[in-house]
Curated annotation (Swiss-Prot):
It is an enzyme of class 1 (oxidoreductase). Pathway: tRNA modification; tRNA-queuosine biosynthesis. Transmembrane segments: none annotated. It comes from Bordetella pertussis (strain Tohama I / ATCC BAA-589 / NCTC 13251). Belongs to the QueH family. This is Epoxyqueuosine reductase QueH.
């Protein structure tokens, strides 16, 4: 593992219990280990109706369940609300990644996370989405804060999970655990656009369920 010293985390003032929205095991691995190392009380909330097809959704979810069980962390498996997701992003099918479709997607996922947190005694929500260098952290934080603002007792923790070596440790943990390595964000439109880009470069299309972190290095 990296020799970088993981910083001790402190929750926003007066906060005690976190509901972590997890998008996948690779992104949440470092977030989980960092919170565990800092003695933070948290649970994982998996609500990602944006992941398609179902085969890909199940692979990503099961990787996250496996890692949560290894660490003894509660894993809350929310509904696979795919039909409502498609309705939410209707008319945005051809918007670029990081655009308004992604904002609508984040809003939907964080709104459900915030509702669950409010109803089950969590005073803080955050997400593993921001650790990925492919994501716009300001976009994610804006969606998270907007969702949390619906409830007087809730805040969105805008901690930058990339800093202090977080991004590097994310990759190291993924290789250590041989996590499934997804090759697109999640939705059918992301899969479509990624495959279009690959074809333009003369590369093979994405094959689901075959690529894992660290496996090639061991061969």
């Amino acid at each position: 593992m990296s020799q970088l010293v993981r910083p001790t985390l402190e929750l926003p003032a007066g906060r005690r219990k976190v509901l972590l929205h997890s998008c996948c095991a690779p992104c949440s691995g470092e977030v989980m280990e960092a919170m565990t190392a800092s003695g933070i009380d948290y649970a994982i909330y998996f609500y990602n109706p944006n992941i398609h097809p179902v085969k890909e959704y199940e692979i990503r979810k099961n990787e996250n369940i496996r890692f949560a069980e290894e660490h003894g962390i509660e894993f809350i498996d929310a509904d696979y609300d795919m039909d409502n997701w498609f309705e939410r992003v209707k008319g945005m099918e051809n918007e670029p990644e990081r655009g308004i479709r992604c904002t609508a997607c984040f809003d939907m996922r964080f709104e459900r996370t915030a509702l669950y947190a409010h109803e089950h005694g969590f005073d803080t929500i955050t997400s593993s989405l921001g650790i990925s260098r492919w994501k716009d952290m300001n976009q994610i934080n804006g969606c998270g804060e907007r969702a949390a603002a619906r409830y007087d007792d809730l805040v969105y923790w805008t901690y930058n999970w990339r800093k202090g070596g977080g991004s590097q440790r994310m990759i190291e943990i993924s290789k250590r655990e041989n996590f499934y390595q997804q090759e697109y964000c999640g939705c059918v439109y992301s899969l479509r656009d990624t495959n279009r880009h690959r074809r333009a470069q003369g590369r093979e299309r994405i094959h689901l369920g075959v690529k894992f972190y660290g496996v090639e290095e061991k061969l």
